[in-house]
A protein has these predicted regions:
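Charge-dense polyanion-binding interfaces
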Residues: 83-100
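Negatively charged, low-complexity tracts enriched in Asp/Glu with abundant Ser/Thr
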Residues: 1-19
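A general structural signal for short secondary-structure boundary/capping elements
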Residues: 20, 31-35, 73-80, 92-93
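A broad, low-specificity signal for short, low-complexity segments enriched in glycine/proline
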Residues: 19-26, 99
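Short aromatic-glycine-(Arg/Gly/Cys) micro-motifs in beta-strand/loop hairpins
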Residues: 23-59
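A short, charged, amphipathic alpha-helix used as a generic interaction element across diverse proteins
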Residues: 56-61, 66-81
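Short, solvent-exposed coil/turn linker segments
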Residues: 17, 41-47, 78-81
């Protein structure tokens, strides 16, 4: 999982809140969307609302960030790591927090 520098001290609390679908106001999540087959960035409140209304296992959280700028940096890091390893966008090789 990719964790932004500004959010590292609160990592445990934020991940627990996400598992419980409980919002944190200044957090962005980076997710794999299996239906759309792409990486997406959501403010966590919007993401939680999507999870509650759709009730599907279409997302895996692969990163959390303190703000949108940090989320963009993490996505850049993810893409660079994917191409270093040479897996393309093979979602099965990325791990994260499954949202149910």
């Amino acid at each position: 999982m990719y964790i932004g520098e500004k959010i590292k001290p609160q990592k445990g609390k934020i991940l627990n809140n996400l598992k419980k679908l409980k919002p944190s106001f200044s957090t962005y999540v980076i997710v794999l969307d299996f239906r759309e087959k792409q990486i997406e960035i959501y403010h966590n409140i919007i993401f939680i609302n999507i999870c509650k209304t759709q009730k599907s296992n279409r997302f895996i959280i692969i990163g959390i960030a303190a703000n949108k700028q940090e989320a963009f940096r993490l996505v850049r890091d993810i893409v660079q790591d994917i191409y270093k390893v040479g897996v393309g966008l093979d979602f099965s090789r990325l791990s994260g927090l499954e949202v149910k």
